[in-house]
Protein backbone atom coordinates (compact mmCIF):
# COMPACT_ATOMS: atom_id res chain seq x y z
CA UNK A 1 0.00 0.00 0.00
CA UNK A 2 1.15 3.53 -0.71
CA UNK A 3 0.64 5.69 2.38
CA UNK A 4 1.06 9.46 2.31
CA UNK A 5 1.04 11.23 5.67
CA UNK A 6 0.23 14.94 5.50
CA UNK A 7 1.37 16.99 8.47
CA UNK A 8 2.66 20.47 9.16
CA UNK A 9 1.76 23.89 10.48
CA UNK A 10 -1.92 24.75 10.91
CA UNK A 11 -3.07 27.01 8.10
CA UNK A 12 -0.37 25.88 5.66
CA UNK A 13 -2.68 23.94 3.33
CA UNK A 14 -3.05 20.43 4.73
CA UNK A 15 -6.77 20.30 3.88
CA UNK A 16 -5.99 21.26 0.29
CA UNK A 17 -3.37 18.50 0.06
CA UNK A 18 -5.69 15.88 1.56
CA UNK A 19 -8.45 16.86 -0.88
CA UNK A 20 -6.06 16.29 -3.78
CA UNK A 21 -5.28 12.81 -2.47
CA UNK A 22 -8.99 12.05 -2.10
CA UNK A 23 -9.66 13.21 -5.66
CA UNK A 24 -6.85 10.90 -6.83
CA UNK A 25 -8.57 7.87 -5.29
CA UNK A 26 -6.82 7.70 -1.93
CA UNK A 27 -8.78 6.60 1.13
CA UNK A 28 -8.35 9.71 3.27
CA UNK A 29 -8.70 10.41 6.98
CA UNK A 30 -8.19 13.79 8.64
CA UNK A 31 -6.85 14.35 12.17
CA UNK A 32 -6.07 10.70 12.87
CA UNK A 33 -3.85 10.09 15.94
CA UNK A 34 -0.64 8.24 15.10
CA UNK A 35 -1.45 5.17 17.20
CA UNK A 36 -4.51 4.41 15.05
CA UNK A 37 -2.73 4.55 11.68
CA UNK A 38 -1.34 0.95 11.77
CA UNK A 39 -4.75 -0.46 12.70
CA UNK A 40 -6.45 1.45 9.89
CA UNK A 41 -3.74 0.33 7.47
CA UNK A 42 -4.25 -3.34 8.35
CA UNK A 43 -7.99 -3.05 7.88
CA UNK A 44 -7.77 -1.24 4.54
CA UNK A 45 -5.11 -3.68 3.34
CA UNK A 46 -7.45 -6.57 4.12
CA UNK A 47 -10.19 -4.85 2.14
CA UNK A 48 -8.02 -4.44 -0.94
CA UNK A 49 -7.24 -0.72 -0.68
CA UNK A 50 -3.92 0.30 -2.21
CA UNK A 51 -3.67 4.03 -1.39
CA UNK A 52 -4.13 5.78 1.95
CA UNK A 53 -3.84 9.46 2.81
CA UNK A 54 -3.75 10.59 6.44
CA UNK A 55 -3.55 14.10 7.86
CA UNK A 56 -2.21 14.35 11.38
CA UNK A 57 -1.17 17.53 13.11
CA UNK A 58 -1.08 19.49 16.34
CA UNK A 59 -4.75 18.71 16.99
CA UNK A 60 -3.53 15.19 17.85
CA UNK A 61 -0.46 16.47 19.69
CA UNK A 62 -0.66 13.83 22.43
CA UNK A 63 0.27 11.19 19.84
CA UNK A 64 2.71 13.13 17.66
CA UNK A 65 5.72 11.73 19.51
CA UNK A 66 4.67 8.29 18.26
CA UNK A 67 4.58 9.30 14.59
CA UNK A 68 8.28 8.67 13.73
CA UNK A 69 8.12 5.14 15.17
CA UNK A 70 4.79 4.57 13.42
CA UNK A 71 6.29 5.63 10.09
CA UNK A 72 9.29 3.32 10.52
CA UNK A 73 7.05 0.36 11.36
CA UNK A 74 4.75 0.98 8.41
CA UNK A 75 7.69 1.46 6.04
CA UNK A 76 8.76 -2.13 6.68
CA UNK A 77 5.70 -3.35 4.78
CA UNK A 78 4.41 -0.38 2.80
CA UNK A 79 5.56 2.59 0.73
CA UNK A 80 5.32 5.49 3.19
CA UNK A 81 5.93 9.16 2.47
CA UNK A 82 5.61 12.08 4.88
CA UNK A 83 4.80 15.53 3.49
CA UNK A 84 5.29 18.49 5.83
CA UNK A 85 3.55 21.74 4.87
CA UNK A 86 4.80 24.99 6.34
CA UNK A 87 4.55 28.74 5.77
CA UNK A 88 6.03 31.92 7.18
CA UNK A 89 4.50 33.36 10.34
CA UNK A 90 3.44 36.51 8.49
CA UNK A 91 1.63 34.45 5.84
CA UNK A 92 -0.12 32.36 8.48
CA UNK A 93 -1.22 35.41 10.48
CA UNK A 94 -2.69 36.90 7.31
CA UNK A 95 -4.56 33.68 6.51
CA UNK A 96 -6.03 33.46 10.00
CA UNK A 97 -7.02 37.11 9.78
CA UNK A 98 -8.82 36.49 6.48
CA UNK A 99 -10.63 33.32 7.57
CA UNK A 100 -11.25 34.35 11.21
CA UNK A 101 -10.53 30.77 12.23
CA UNK A 102 -8.91 29.94 15.54
CA UNK A 103 -5.45 28.42 15.76
CA UNK A 104 -5.54 25.08 17.63
CA UNK A 105 -3.07 26.39 20.23
CA UNK A 106 -4.44 29.93 20.49
CA UNK A 107 -6.21 31.27 23.54
CA UNK A 108 -8.84 33.96 23.74
CA UNK A 109 -7.15 37.15 24.84
CA UNK A 110 -9.93 39.75 24.92
CA UNK A 111 -13.67 40.01 24.84
CA UNK A 112 -13.94 42.32 21.85
CA UNK A 113 -15.87 40.55 19.06
CA UNK A 114 -14.74 40.53 15.45
CA UNK A 115 -16.57 42.30 12.61
CA UNK A 116 -19.12 39.50 12.30
CA UNK A 117 -19.61 39.00 16.01
CA UNK A 118 -17.14 36.12 16.17
CA UNK A 119 -14.55 35.89 18.98
CA UNK A 120 -11.46 38.02 18.35
CA UNK A 121 -7.92 36.84 19.05
CA UNK A 122 -4.85 38.95 19.67
CA UNK A 123 -2.22 38.79 16.89
CA UNK A 124 0.56 38.46 19.45
CA UNK A 125 -1.08 35.40 21.00
CA UNK A 126 -1.62 33.98 17.51
CA UNK A 127 2.05 34.43 16.60
CA UNK A 128 3.08 32.78 19.86
CA UNK A 129 0.80 29.84 19.06
CA UNK A 130 2.30 29.50 15.58
CA UNK A 131 5.87 29.54 16.91
CA UNK A 132 4.95 27.06 19.64
CA UNK A 133 3.48 24.74 17.03
CA UNK A 134 6.54 25.18 14.82
CA UNK A 135 8.81 24.13 17.70
CA UNK A 136 6.64 21.13 18.59
CA UNK A 137 6.56 19.87 15.01
CA UNK A 138 10.20 20.54 14.11
CA UNK A 139 11.28 16.89 14.63
CA UNK A 140 8.68 15.80 12.06
CA UNK A 141 9.80 18.42 9.55
CA UNK A 142 13.38 17.16 9.61
CA UNK A 143 12.38 13.71 8.37
CA UNK A 144 9.74 14.77 5.83
CA UNK A 145 9.47 16.26 2.38
CA UNK A 146 8.85 19.94 3.16
CA UNK A 147 6.70 22.28 1.09
CA UNK A 148 6.69 26.00 1.86
CA UNK A 149 3.31 27.48 0.91
CA UNK A 150 4.02 31.07 2.03
CA UNK A 151 3.70 32.64 -1.41
CA UNK A 152 1.78 29.84 -3.06
CA UNK A 153 -1.74 30.03 -4.41
CA UNK A 154 -4.18 27.21 -3.72
CA UNK A 155 -4.28 25.99 -7.32
CA UNK A 156 -0.48 25.93 -7.41
CA UNK A 157 -0.33 23.82 -4.25
CA UNK A 158 -2.86 21.42 -5.76
CA UNK A 159 -0.65 21.12 -8.83
CA UNK A 160 2.43 20.39 -6.71
CA UNK A 161 0.67 17.66 -4.71
CA UNK A 162 -0.57 16.07 -7.93
CA UNK A 163 3.01 15.95 -9.18
CA UNK A 164 4.24 14.35 -5.97
CA UNK A 165 1.71 11.52 -6.12
CA UNK A 166 1.95 10.93 -9.85
CA UNK A 167 4.70 8.29 -9.66
CA UNK A 168 4.32 5.32 -7.32
CA UNK A 169 7.98 4.32 -7.58
CA UNK A 170 9.89 3.89 -4.34
CA UNK A 171 13.03 5.55 -5.74
CA UNK A 172 14.11 8.98 -4.59
CA UNK A 173 12.31 11.81 -6.39
CA UNK A 174 14.53 14.71 -7.42
CA UNK A 175 12.66 18.03 -7.43
CA UNK A 176 14.09 21.12 -9.14
CA UNK A 177 12.40 24.34 -8.05
CA UNK A 178 12.95 27.82 -9.48
CA UNK A 179 12.24 30.87 -7.34
CA UNK A 180 12.84 34.60 -7.05
CA UNK A 181 15.00 35.86 -4.20
CA UNK A 182 12.84 38.97 -3.90
CA UNK A 183 10.01 36.68 -2.79
CA UNK A 184 12.14 34.75 -0.29
CA UNK A 185 14.12 31.51 -0.32
CA UNK A 186 11.99 28.32 -0.20
CA UNK A 187 12.25 26.83 3.27
CA UNK A 188 11.68 23.34 1.85
CA UNK A 189 14.92 23.34 -0.17
CA UNK A 190 17.71 20.84 0.55
CA UNK A 191 20.12 22.66 -1.78
CA UNK A 192 19.97 26.32 -2.87
CA UNK A 193 21.87 27.78 -5.83
CA UNK A 194 22.05 31.50 -6.61
CA UNK A 195 22.15 32.33 -10.35
CA UNK A 196 21.62 36.09 -10.06
CA UNK A 197 25.11 36.76 -11.42
CA UNK A 198 24.16 35.38 -14.84
CA UNK A 199 23.19 37.67 -17.76
CA UNK A 200 19.57 38.74 -17.27
CA UNK A 201 17.06 38.51 -20.16
CA UNK A 202 14.87 40.96 -18.24
CA UNK A 203 16.85 43.85 -19.68
CA UNK A 204 15.94 42.86 -23.23
CA UNK A 205 12.48 44.38 -23.76
CA UNK A 206 11.55 41.65 -26.24
CA UNK A 207 12.36 38.93 -23.69
CA UNK A 208 11.03 40.63 -20.56
CA UNK A 209 7.44 39.28 -20.75
CA UNK A 210 8.64 35.75 -21.53
CA UNK A 211 9.91 33.03 -19.18
CA UNK A 212 12.83 30.64 -19.08
CA UNK A 213 10.65 28.03 -20.80
CA UNK A 214 10.23 30.14 -23.95
CA UNK A 215 12.50 29.52 -26.94
CA UNK A 216 13.78 33.11 -27.35
CA UNK A 217 14.90 33.19 -23.70
CA UNK A 218 16.44 29.73 -23.98
CA UNK A 219 18.37 30.80 -27.08
CA UNK A 220 19.59 33.95 -25.31
CA UNK A 221 20.83 32.07 -22.25
CA UNK A 222 22.34 29.15 -24.15
CA UNK A 223 24.48 31.62 -26.09
CA UNK A 224 26.14 32.76 -22.84
CA UNK A 225 29.20 30.64 -21.87
CA UNK A 226 28.82 31.78 -18.26
CA UNK A 227 25.30 30.33 -18.12
CA UNK A 228 26.39 26.97 -19.49
CA UNK A 229 29.36 26.83 -17.12
CA UNK A 230 27.23 27.50 -14.05
CA UNK A 231 24.59 24.98 -15.12
CA UNK A 232 27.33 22.38 -15.55
CA UNK A 233 28.84 23.14 -12.13
CA UNK A 234 25.44 22.78 -10.44
CA UNK A 235 24.78 19.54 -12.32
CA UNK A 236 28.13 18.10 -11.25
CA UNK A 237 27.56 19.07 -7.61
CA UNK A 238 24.09 17.53 -7.46
CA UNK A 239 25.24 14.40 -9.25
CA UNK A 240 28.19 13.98 -6.88
CA UNK A 241 26.11 14.18 -3.71
CA UNK A 242 22.91 12.51 -4.92
CA UNK A 243 24.06 9.01 -3.86
CA UNK A 244 24.44 10.17 -0.24
CA UNK A 245 20.82 11.31 -0.16
CA UNK A 246 19.69 8.03 -1.70
CA UNK A 247 21.70 6.12 0.92
CA UNK A 248 19.94 8.16 3.61
CA UNK A 249 16.61 6.65 2.46
CA UNK A 250 15.23 10.03 1.42
CA UNK A 251 11.99 10.07 -0.56
CA UNK A 252 12.60 13.54 -2.03
CA UNK A 253 15.52 15.87 -2.66
CA UNK A 254 14.61 19.49 -3.43
CA UNK A 255 17.14 21.56 -5.37
CA UNK A 256 16.18 25.25 -5.48
CA UNK A 257 17.53 27.58 -8.16
CA UNK A 258 17.07 31.30 -7.51
CA UNK A 259 17.36 34.44 -9.60
CA UNK A 260 15.98 37.90 -8.86
CA UNK A 261 12.35 37.45 -9.92
CA UNK A 262 12.11 33.72 -10.62
CA UNK A 263 11.00 34.21 -14.22
CA UNK A 264 13.95 33.76 -16.59
CA UNK A 265 17.35 32.48 -15.44
CA UNK A 266 16.29 30.22 -12.57
CA UNK A 267 13.49 28.74 -14.68
CA UNK A 268 15.89 27.95 -17.51
CA UNK A 269 18.49 26.37 -15.21
CA UNK A 270 15.86 24.30 -13.36
CA UNK A 271 14.44 22.99 -16.64
CA UNK A 272 17.93 22.22 -17.99
CA UNK A 273 18.87 20.27 -14.86
CA UNK A 274 15.56 18.41 -14.81
CA UNK A 275 16.02 17.34 -18.43
CA UNK A 276 19.47 15.95 -17.62
CA UNK A 277 18.51 14.08 -14.46
CA UNK A 278 15.37 12.48 -15.92
CA UNK A 279 17.63 9.72 -17.20
CA UNK A 280 18.56 8.97 -13.57
CA UNK A 281 15.04 8.35 -12.24
CA UNK A 282 12.05 10.26 -10.91
CA UNK A 283 12.34 13.98 -11.58
CA UNK A 284 9.88 16.81 -10.97
CA UNK A 285 10.23 20.49 -11.81
CA UNK A 286 8.20 23.37 -10.44
CA UNK A 287 8.42 27.12 -10.84
CA UNK A 288 7.24 28.90 -7.72
CA UNK A 289 6.77 32.32 -9.29
CA UNK A 290 5.05 31.11 -12.48
CA UNK A 291 1.45 30.04 -12.95
CA UNK A 292 1.08 26.24 -13.23
CA UNK A 293 1.34 25.01 -16.81
CA UNK A 294 -2.01 24.12 -18.31
Swiss-Prot record:
Q: Does this entry carry the keyword Nucleotide-binding?
A: yes
Q: Which residues bind ATP?
A: 8-15
Q: What Pfam families does the record point to? A: PapZ_C (PF22740), RapZ-like_N (PF03668)
Q: Which parts of the sequence bind GTP?
A: 57-60
Keyword list (alphabetical) reads: ATP-binding, GTP-binding, Nucleotide-binding
What's an example of a GO molecular-function annotation for this chain? Answer: ATP binding
Similarity field = Belongs to the RapZ-like family.
What task does this protein carry out?
Displays ATPase and GTPase activities.
Name listed for the protein in its UniProt record = Nucleotide-binding protein H16_A0381
Species this protein is from: Cupriavidus necator (strain ATCC 17699 / DSM 428 / KCTC 22496 / NCIMB 10442 / H16 / Stanier 337) (Ralstonia eutropha)
